Amino acid sequence: MSRTRAFAVTLTIPDNEAFTAFETLGRLGLDVGRVVRADVWLFEIDGDDAELGATVASIETIHNPNKHRLSERDSDRPAAGEVWIAPRDEAPATLVAGRPIAGVRAIRRRTAWRLLDDQGADVPAAELNRAVDAFLCNPAFQVAIKA
């Protein structure tokens, strides 16, 4: 029986993509206090691979300990207040940097966006939807996945 484990990779250094999104959303008239971005890696595995976290942490193209923080997520779906952007016609990968990962049947990558107000709370769903439609997702080749 297969299941999916999700890992988030965030930057410990300033995130230029999140900064650019913040500036652009402001110019588009959206009231956002902060933008948080993460790469989410989804691994479809057979059984229970207790070593997967250590394996993912050792793959330099996913996680560089000098600038990234790696954490396993509780769910393989976006949290409330979050949107994941994915390629529209995605074919799951089976290799990372040309290497297979034992026990992994499929690998998918998402970009997670969370928009916060000035108090650090999630912006209202309508504001998140506006951001997705106006900037965060290009429907020609991407899909937005919400909670």
Labelled PLM ranges:
Residues 1-147:
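Core nucleic-acid recognition elements
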